[in-house]
Swiss-Prot record:
It is found in: Cytoplasm; Cytoplasm, Cytoskeleton, Microtubule organizing center, Centrosome. The gene is HSPA1B. It comes from Sus scrofa. The modification Omega-N-methylarginine is found at residue 469. GO terms for cellular component: centrosome; cytoplasm; cytosol; nucleus; plasma membrane. This is Heat shock 70 kDa protein 1B. Pfam families: HSP70.
Amino acid sequence: MAKSVAIGIDLGTTYSCVGVFQHGKVEIIANDQGNRTTPSYVAFTDTERLIGDAAKNQVALNPQNTVFDAKRLIGRKFGDPVVQADMKHWPFRVINDGDKPKVQVSYKGETKAFYPEEISSMVLTKMKEIAEAYLGHPVSNAVITVPAYFNDSQRQATKDAGVIAGLNVLRIINEPTAAAIAYGLDRTGKGERNVLIFDLGGGTFDVSILTIDDGIFEVKATAGDTHLGGEDFDNRLVNHFVEEFKRKHKKDISQNKRAVRRLRTACERAKRTLSSSTQASLEIDSLFEGIDFYTSITRARFEELCSDLFRSTLEPVEKALRDAKLDKAQIHDLVLVGGSTRIPKVQKLLQDFFNGRDLNKSINPDEAVAYGAAVQAAILMGDKSENVQDLLLLDVAPLSLGLETAGGVMTALIKRNSTIPTKQTQIFTTYSDNQPGVLIQVYEGERAMTRDNNLLGRFELSGIPPAPRGVPQIEVTFDIDANGILNVTATDKSTGKANKITITNDKGRLSKEEIERMVQEAEKYKAEDEIQRERVSAKNALESYAFNMKSAVEDEGLKGKISEADKKKVLDKCQEVISWLDANTLAEKDEFEHKRKELEQVCNPIISGLYQGAGGPGAGGFGAQAPKGGSGSGPTIEEVD
């Protein structure tokens, strides 16, 4: 019996790819057509079901029953605006089944409806068969990749698709992380390197920043757009030619699904041509009502049609840099992943953004993700080859995790972007005397108050022996494993009594948009808070400086050392500033600083004359008010200093 191998599958929106790690290297496996990537297409006909190239090749003849883009539906609700928007572009029907989308097709003369998981499982089955044909024996273990931005229901649904395909899914990993592994094996150089992975595929766009150091990968930040890719560029071309056809032939082909599909196929081909040539021609015989459509498009025109989409790829790059707290000069390597990164304009924008830095194209952008997934699969199967042995992969928690303490405050134990797996422990105590139990409420989010964050779960720890407030010691541990499953345990140290909750990441968690929104909101509020803090400290500094100066010149010990004229000058100016402060408590930071400069110009020459080089009394800011005790409502648990 051959030792069991595991495969790595890049389940793409438009194309999928499979690899296997054996004999110390990765093989990307070609399908029966000799192609190393396989279209993520499934077609249903009167006689059979087709998957991959065979499905894509007959799409123009059978558009209603050829399903693609299942990845855009997987793990989403029917009412999701993304689903609603995409449905307009699809020639196949999507129906609503209890707010779950299903694809309706005609198969062997019957109407059938499939869940997105089922469609994806058919593609996964095809990838599994491609690997089995190459290896010559059955394969069941696999690592499957998803975009970094997939939320938990999308990840879970992808895992379900694997199970439906008869795979034992060892792990779901992020596509950029997989690409980084592929890259890491190629680069064994010493020292820490920051790598930015720019993955623009058929359907999703991900930017990730990783630190690679001595075989250890750490994901520092991820950003992107679950809805940007090669297909969006195809759509722009399709719309352009639909308009051109209207102008030339006074006919609207947009309602004819077969015509649009044939046009789209020609557009995709033209787009690929434009990556290597500056012009591409389209020749479609009898496109609509017997009219032949012969036309051409230049690279410049294509770039113009997609200019806003191309430019929008830089925003997530900036966001990822911000999240990773890195400057663009600190990125050592830029890695291109995904077929759309072959577009010269996209490469140029990225290169210009990084001030002419060379891009790394050594990895075939279509295969990098499957390559890394295959390596990860080998690691999880315990492959002992030295290429793989010292490779470690660290993922991150997308949001901070913590619990509610007195007054509804969010106390984070695990910070956003912390490397997982991780374990954090903190001691808490009771809020009132003889409190018999505590309610542990677990939240995720970036805001200061729990009411603005997302409640993941709660549990009681009861049976705490009567004691004054602040005496009992309750140890709370947050433990996240490599799959992102969170265990929260609370233990009363005096009795050893414990209770716990396991929060799996499959149901009712936040979507990418919500995570994004919460992070953005938190960033926005954080910026507002920062401005407010600076304003208050400028006001306090001015106020204390004015009062210090006032008391300095009124000091009995200075009698005779300061002329009455100077004294009056300082006191009048101080009084003017104090009155201005009373009238302008809400002034901006700049105004407070400006007033202080004015006051210093009057006071400094006089005061420094007095103290001969000794600095005058410093302007100590007033300390912030101590926070008030938390309200009596809410879980009565308090953080121990």
